[in-house]
Amino acid sequence: MTAPWQKSFLAFAGPGIDHPSDALRVTDSEAADILSTLAAQTWSAPIPARLARQPGYAICHACDGFNTALFGPDGIVGFYAGSYLWIAGAHRGKGLSTPLILAAAERRGGSILPPGIVLQGYTPAGLAAHRKAHHQAILEATERVIPGRVRRPGAIDFVQLRLAGATR
């Protein structure tokens, strides 16, 4: 299985990166419909260490299919379901999108595109979140191979030059 850091950003996120649009935002009513479907699914045990810096949250994969959910104290507060990424308003801005995106990508073979999907759209904010997640995956991989390297000035430039396709 390929890890997210082993893919170019284009392979990680798909060709939809070229045309972000706010029209692609998941509304709260759309999210409510998806949440009702997700509530009926059986979930895996929480993924260890993915949310180490965000206590009170857990990420789990659906036992069937490729959905990934972010659980808070009161149940699902975010998801990557199909090609839809959403986090409830009260939980945004807490650094939760990066671990959710990376967990979904790991489940899907290194890309966030679910099986059978070749094009996925993004809002500008969603595209930025996916870029941040992809960079984070590369930095984590680099830190495992070259401890201390990512803490040096210009680390992301080094990573982009040395590892396959951190840019488009």
Task: State each model region's role.
Residues 94-99:
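Glycine-rich phosphate-binding loop
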Residues 1-91, 102-117, 121-127, 135-168:
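Non-catalytic substrate-recognition and accessory regions of acyl/acetyltransferase enzymes
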